[in-house]
């Protein structure tokens, strides 16, 4: 029989677990939502599979609300002995994933509605969001590896959702092969870290890396960055991006362009300062060079593109470079992390708005070539306004959210004595104006081809798509107009690890 002391200890442990679980409500809701989505997909008839999407969207919004509640009322703390880090950065990501995931469900509705695997698609999307949330919260190398693998598996299947499409199958295979290679490289790098520290805790790894040979530090960190850089579509880990976006269903491309990317960047922002404290091996300079290469390659490769999805793929690579500027500034500026958080919010809104309009044009005109956008302004002014807001915000036109986001990451770079990076970013921003304006000019100035079908008002079944575009376009404007209070909130995300 257990004695009284043992019972008291067990009771204390139980109470401690319950307290810790209260900080994990966003993860718990997404977990429950994912499991129930699988069950509903199995039991509901084909005509009712749309209910799975409604449930998944509700679970995402619930996770976002609880993330905000924890952020405002409970504070920040390591959970499960530091395996899970509940702090301003991870909770902001959880809220952003919740809202963005729900919007992606709305974008997917007109594409997957009535298909054989509609419920399965929504369940996969939910599991991918759960994995992305855990990736942003990982304070342990084991959880980091598990989240990367789970996220890769779910998004790989989503990319190949259109099994009858050869392009979708090709995109899925390329995504899988590159994901497998990058995952293996990351696992190898993490094994080095474990060998050095004798622990999977990132804090323990950081202490061990401070005493390790510099060559070992550089090599192992580069391997880990291979896996995380693949998620964020950073150069030179970006090669899968244009083919995957172009071959996948457009709602999946929209999802890939936002959620895994931001989760990967947040993981990099968490891992590097913990594992390489005090700018060990000059990691901030290395990340700054990576940011410069990423934005430059993305913008230059986007210039000749006529396929708007591939153009957005290269644009998203360039945007990763701008976002990475916030990470590069972390070690030498308190402005880096708030700038990253604010720009992530702006990027999610404007990129989802852009993909939403492209999806509408594809469904109405059967193409995503620039010529398909000709005459769009006359045929459907609403889509053109949303397209213009999204593309001009991606460029960085004031007072839109993208302008404020870029301004803040530029300030962070200058504050961190990386003015050269800010100059490169400004030059890249000017370059990007050309390809964004090409699409806008086709929609506003060019007449429609005689054989083209005019864009008509979306059918009632497309109401979720219209709502998603309206919300994201409004957020693109609103985040810019209300930039100051939003940035003050973003500054709370400088708290890492409690």
Regions found by a protein language model. Give the residues of each.
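Alpha-helical transmembrane segments of multi-pass membrane proteins predominantly involved
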Residues: 2-498
């Amino acid at each position: 029989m257990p004695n009284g002391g043992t019972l008291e200890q067990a009771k204390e442990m139980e109470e401690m677990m319950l307290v810790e679980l209260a900080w994990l409500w966003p993860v718990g809701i997404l977990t429950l939502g994912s499991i129930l989505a699988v069950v509903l997909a199995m039991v509901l008839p084909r005509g009712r599979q749309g209910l799975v999407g409604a449930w998944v969207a509700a679970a995402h919004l619930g996770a976002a609300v609880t993330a905000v509640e924890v952020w405002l009322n409970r504070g920040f703390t390591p959970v499960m002995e530091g395996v899970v880090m509940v702090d301003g950065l991870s909770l902001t990501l959880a809220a952003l994933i919740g809202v963005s995931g729900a919007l992606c469900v709305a974008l997917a509705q007109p594409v997957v509605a009535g298909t054989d695997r509609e419920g399965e698609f929504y369940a996969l999307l939910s599991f991918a969001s759960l994995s992305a949330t855990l990736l942003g919260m990982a304070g342990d190398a084991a959880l980091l590896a598990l989240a990367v693998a789970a996220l890769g598996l779910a998004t790989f299947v989503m990319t190949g959702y259109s099994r009858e499409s050869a392009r979708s199958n090709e995109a899925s295979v390329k995504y899988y092969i590159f994901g497998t290679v990058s995952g293996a490289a990351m696992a190898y790098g993490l094994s080095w870290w474990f060998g050095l520290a004798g622990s999977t805790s990132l804090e323990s790894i950081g202490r061990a890396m401070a005493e390790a040979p510099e060559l070992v530090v550089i090599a192992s960190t580069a391997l880990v960055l291979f896996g995380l850089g693949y998620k964020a579509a950073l150069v030179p880990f970006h090669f899968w991006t244009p083919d995957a976006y172009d071959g996948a269903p457009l709602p999946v491309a929209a999802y890939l362009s936002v959620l895994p990317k931001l989760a990967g960047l947040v993981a990099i922002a968490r891992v590097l300062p913990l594992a390489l404290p005090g700018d060990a091996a000059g990691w901030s300079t290395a990340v700054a060079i990576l940011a410069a290469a990423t934005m430059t390659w993305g913008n230059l490769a986007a210039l000749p593109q006529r396929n708007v999805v591939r153009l957005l793929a290269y644009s998203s690579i360039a945007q990763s470079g701008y976002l990475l500027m916030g990470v590069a500034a972390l070690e030498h500026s308190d402005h880096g992390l708030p700038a990253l958080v604010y720009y992530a919010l702006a990027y999610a809104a404007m990129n989802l708005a852009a993909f939403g309009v492209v999806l509408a044009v594809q469904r109405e005109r059967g193409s995503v070539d620039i010529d398909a956008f000709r005459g769009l302004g006359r045929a459907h002014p609403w889509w053109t306004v949303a397209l213009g807001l999204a593309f001009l915000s991606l460029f960085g036109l004031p007072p839109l959210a993208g302008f404020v986001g870029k301004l803040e990451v530029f300030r962070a770079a200058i504050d961190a004595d990386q003015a050269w990076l800010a100059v490169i970013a400004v030059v890249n921003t000017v370059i990007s104006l050309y390809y964004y304006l090409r699409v806008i000019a086709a929609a506003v100035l060019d007449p429609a081809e005689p054989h083209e079908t005019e864009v008509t008002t979306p059918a009632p079944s497309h109401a979720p798509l219209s709502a998603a575009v309206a919300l994201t376009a409004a957020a693109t404007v609103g985040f810019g107009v209300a930039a100051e209070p939003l940035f003050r909130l973003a500054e709370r995300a400088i708290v890492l690890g409690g």
